[in-house]
Amino acid sequence: MDKFWTFLTALHSGAGPIVMLLYPLYASVIAMESTTKVDDEQWLAYWIIYSFLSLTELILQSLIEWIPIWYTVKLVFVAWLVLPQFQGAAFIYNRVVREQFKKHGVLRSTHSKPTKPNILHSIFPHREGHEAHSH
């Protein structure tokens, strides 16, 4: 029974990097090489949400240490984000991230201009045609 428990523990520990990093990295490269834009949006949404989750963990690290099932909950949540059957990352991005950015005037809606100064626009001005800069 000890060997089985050791195996399960190792499997549980290894699942995190595979689900949270390796599979998303692989799928992101495949998406970038495909002609469709839908998969690009799914994986860009994933990396935005995963980055936010990682930053939140850094900030709340001392609190999270007291939650014994945190790693398992995070693993299940990230699996929901990455599995193509669920498209959780796109769902969270569209329902939460995009709406919050619109609400705070960071993103322009399709019919109106931002009500507040767009700080991201001042940092990263939009360039027509997305031309590359040569150095």
Swiss-Prot record:
InterPro entries: TB2_DP1_HVA22. It is found in: Membrane. It is a multi-pass membrane protein. It comes from the Eukaryota. Induction: By abscisic acid (ABA), cold, drought and salt stresses. One of its GO terms (cellular component) is membrane. Keywords: Membrane, Stress response, Transmembrane, Transmembrane helix. Its main location: membrane. GO terms for biological process: flower development; hyperosmotic salinity response; negative regulation of autophagy; pollen development; response to abscisic acid; response to cold; response to water deprivation. Predominantly expressed in flower buds. The chain crosses the membrane at residues 11-31, 42-62, 63-83. Belongs to the DP1 family. This is HVA22-like protein d. The gene is HVA22D.
